[in-house]
UniProtKB/Swiss-Prot annotation:
Coiled-coil stretches noted in the UniProt entry, renumbered to this chain: none
Keyword Lyase in record: yes
Organism this protein belongs to: Desulfotalea psychrophila (strain LSv54 / DSM 12343)
Catalysis performed (reactions): 2-(N(omega)-L-arginino)succinate = fumarate + L-arginine
Protein name: Argininosuccinate lyase
Length: 464
């Protein structure tokens, strides 16, 4: 280690310079550089407040604002050099400010610590990302309503335990995903409300003795208010964990959709045709059309879940207040945001180019005793207790399996061997169309209910 005295902005207490290996290991500028515009905006608001409170002069404020603007312009132009020796985005910008305007620049950090400064930058960045995620979720929801409108009235099998269960409208299935992503949207907005409190002015962890005005800075930066406890503010990363939890849920929903698209596109199902532009081929098998984009979306769920686990594990044992461990919060969040944003965008695009094979979907409802529940409901309407009706239909299904036929293939006489209350009107309820149209309960797959739900969804996404 060199004997040279530290030249860091915080280096007054140190007699030796930081080792190069330590500098490389501890730097964060390689990734927190994306926060630069928030750091500059926060510094401008902070400087303005310091001037208003008489802590710096109007002339110094003017120099600081001009210096920060010139730094931002250089960053935007790609000519600003970020250096690992200055560790992070804050120190790079502050050092550049001091280099450009001299003593006035060294007055900017009064009543501020990097602890509350990074929390400010991070929250402002996440706030913007929440707004962007809402736009992407709206786009995904819009895609589901467009597909739903296109195939309104078409029927496919619904599944439980990956076995054919009951017939449903394709639109009903698409609206199920619409509901998932609307909940995701609500969660993001709810998360945004909680993170929209300014931490600036809490300083390192105990507040400051200087006569600052936290509310002025919060208002200038668009925050709803200020945080209430300086120790909690310095220690807090709930907002990062909460948002990443929301992102994990979004990617989970995307993964479930992707899994269905992969399955439905197989030769065994043939329910959907994913556009060639969202598939790839094989390097050895000429016939292959692989649903790689859907598979990648499904696969990326692992890295988003990993980001959440990383954050939770990093925070679980930290005493109050700030610890350097918290520097490790940003990369997982950045990666989760980037991954989910890209996945949402390409999912909406892929859905817009996907086609359902409606004939094949309808054909799949003709086997697997998919209207067995309808027969049980029919018996209930004939005053047969449901458990008895369930047993009767189960016996009929077993007989059909032995005979190698489906329920609609039985004659009325054969039906009546299982229950004498069965009449000729039974065959109307054993069709997929009859089954779907009977599901008129709120939230059900009946055409009337689905049309109502689709119209409401279209209104919510701005189509109708």
């Amino acid at each position: 280690m060199t004997e040279q005295k530290s030249k860091k902005l915080w280096g007054g207490r140190f007699s030796e310079a930081m080792a190069a290996s330590v500098e490389k290991f501890s730097e964060s500028i390689s990734y927190d550089v994306r926060l630069y515009k928030y750091d500059i905006a926060g510094s401008k608001a902070h400087a303005t407040m310091l001037s208003s409170q008489g802590i710096i002069s109007p002339e110094e404020l003017e120099q600081i604002i001009a210096g920060l603007s010139s730094i931002e312009a250089d960053i935007e132009a790609g000519v600003f050099e970020f250096k690992t020796e200055y560790e992070d985005v804050h120190m790079n910008i502050e050092q550049a400010l001091v280099d450009r305007i001299g003593a006035a620049g060294s007055r900017l950090h009064a009543a501020r610590s990097r602890n509350d400064q990074i929390a400010l930058d991070f929250k402002m960045y996440l706030r913007d990302q929440c707004d962007h995620l809402v736009e992407l979720l709206d786009g995904a929801c819009r895609a589901f309503t467009v597909v739903g409108r296109k195939y309104l009235g078409d029927i496919m099998p619904g599944y439980t335990h990956t076995q054919r269960a009951q017939p449903v409208l394709i639109t009903h299935h698409m609206l199920a995903y619409y509901e998932m992503f609307r909940r995701d949207r609500d969660r993001i907005l709810d998360c945004r409300k909680r993170l929209n409190l300014s931490p600036l002015g809490c300083a390192a962890m105990a507040g400051t003795g200087l006569p600052i005005n936290r509310e002025q800075v919060a208002k200038a930066l668009g925050f709803a208010g200020v945080t209430a406890n300086s120790m909690d503010t310095s220690a807090d990363r709930d907002y990062a964990i909460e948002l990443t939890s929301c992102l994990t849920m979004i990617q989970l929903h995307l993964s479930r959709l992707a899994e269905e698209l992969v399955t439905w596109s197989t030769s065994e199902y043939k329910f959907v045709d994913i556009s060639d532009s969202f598939c790839t081929g094989s390097s050895i098998m000429p016939q292959k059309k692989n649903p790689d984009i859907a598979e990648l979306i499904r696969g990326k769920s692992g890295r988003v879940v990993g980001s959440l686990i990383s954050l939770i594990t990093m925070m679980k044992g930290l005493p109050l207040t700030y610890n350097r461990d918290q520097q490790e919060d940003k990369e997982p969040v950045f990666d989760a945001i980037d991954t989910v944003s890209a996945s949402l965008s390409i999912t909406a695009e892929m859905m817009a180019h996907m086609k359902f094979n409606t004939a094949r979907c309808a054909e799949a409802t003709e086997t697997g005793f998919i209207t067995a529940t309808d027969l049980a409901d029919y018996l209930v309407m004939k005053d047969v207790p449901f458990r008895q009706a369930h047993h009767i239909v189960g016996s009929a299904v077993a007989a059909c399996i032995a005979k190698g036929c489906e329920l609609p293939d039985l004659t009325l006489t054969e039906m009546q061997e299982f229950s004498p209350v069965i009449e000729s009107d039974v065959f109307a309820v054993l069709t997929a169309e009859g089954s779907v149209n009977s599901r008129v309960s709120t939230g059900g797959t009946g055409l009337v209910r689905v049309t109502e739900a689709l119209t409401l969804a279209e209104k919510c996404v701005g189509i109708a």
